[in-house]
Amino acid sequence: GDVYKRQEIKKEISSFKKDGKRVPSLSIVLVGNHTASSIYVNAKVRACKDVGIDVNLINLNDNISELDLLEIISELNNKSDLDGFIVQLPLPPQVNVQNVIDSISPAKDVDGFTNDNIGSITSEVKKLLPATGLGVMTLIERYNIDIESKSCAILGSSRNVGAAIAQMLMQKEQVTVTVCNSKTKNLKEITSNADIIISAVGKPNLVTSDMVKEGAVICLLYTSPSPRDDL
């Protein structure tokens, strides 16, 4: 699914160039040297370069003040030749994450984390939906996975990922969704009865074979430090 989508985007951007149009541009703000964040960001940079998106990585020191970070975001909001940007999470403790998200222009919010964009999940007018959830829905559509009247277990209840995916699924199809978190006691029982399992906690090996019934569809959301052909 990912390969075909990239080919489509690459072809579309190539047509922009042929028509003399500006190619899409993206900035990624990375604060500090968080290992997992660096892995995610590097994957995003590679994906952008692969399809021809003009990508710019902005590396900031982890001792940056919230005010200074908000000033940088304001500059990105007002940059006319920039189509969108991402502020990679997590952020250092001196920075209020919600303040940062709230400061991002919804029109440039590529991750789809602002209240305006997340709120549009349940609206008739869809805006920039949370990117991970949109990716999951695209995979379901591309592989023609029938989810109508099926049961789906989502592992992870974060507002921007797990909860957002649950909302998208319930908006699109008649699917029964169970959202699990770290306090869920009967996790194995829930997953063993699920037709679809979506692990949205960013950890490999969380779902084991004894937790899955035969014929179930499994979607694992995480980036491995080393590429694997079986994912």
Roles of regions detected by a PLM:
Residues 87-152:
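Anion-binding alpha/beta catalytic cores of soluble intermediary-metabolism enzymes, centered on
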Residues 2-18:
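Positively charged, low-complexity intrinsically disordered leader regions
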Residues 37-43, 130-206, 217:
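Glycine-rich phosphate/diphosphate-binding loop of Rossmann-like nucleotide-binding domains
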Residues 1-4, 222-231:
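Single conserved hydrophobic/aromatic residue that forms the stacking wall/gate
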Residues 214-224:
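ADP-ribose/adenylate-binding Rossmann-like module
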Residues 49-60, 177-179:
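Short beta-strand elements in bilobed, periplasmic/extracellular small-molecule ligand-binding domains
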Residues 32, 57-66, 182-184:
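Short beta->alpha junction loops
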